[in-house]
Amino acid sequence: CRYICPLGAALAIPSKFRLFDWLKRRKECGNPCQLCAKECEIQAIHPDGRINGNECHYCLDCQMTYHNDNKCPPLINKRKKRGKKAADPQLIPAVEVSDA
């Protein structure tokens, strides 16, 4: 289907004329993270993290993972770092102010 189907070839033509790339990627996508590439049923995501527009069916499964704080490894790492920074809260003493 990927190489022989004329419908697949016809669907790949509009991707050649894209004005902008609207599928988001992070610098961590591809190396070290391969989660989206493993989840892509079409295998349109290269090992380096680039999405092949000619093969992508725009199912947006990779984008669901990209924006999921509980699934995307770079977002999980950022959340853990934020949690470590906020782990030691500083207590501010309260002072009662009178209406005098």
Curated annotation (Swiss-Prot):
Record-level GO cellular component terms:
plasma membrane
A GO molecular function term, named singly, is: DNA binding
Q: Which UniProt keywords apply?
A: Activator, Cell membrane, DNA-binding, Membrane, Transcription, Transcription regulation
* Compartments where located: Cell membrane
Q: What is its main location?
A: membrane
Provide the disulphide bond pattern.
none
Question: Which InterPro entries does the record associate with it?
Answer: NosR_regulator (IPR052378)
From which domain of life does this come? Bacteria
Membrane topology for this entry? Peripheral membrane protein
User: Which function does this protein serve?
Assistant: Transcriptional activator of the nitrous-oxide reductase gene NosZ.
This chain's protein is named: Regulatory protein NosR
The gene name reads nosR
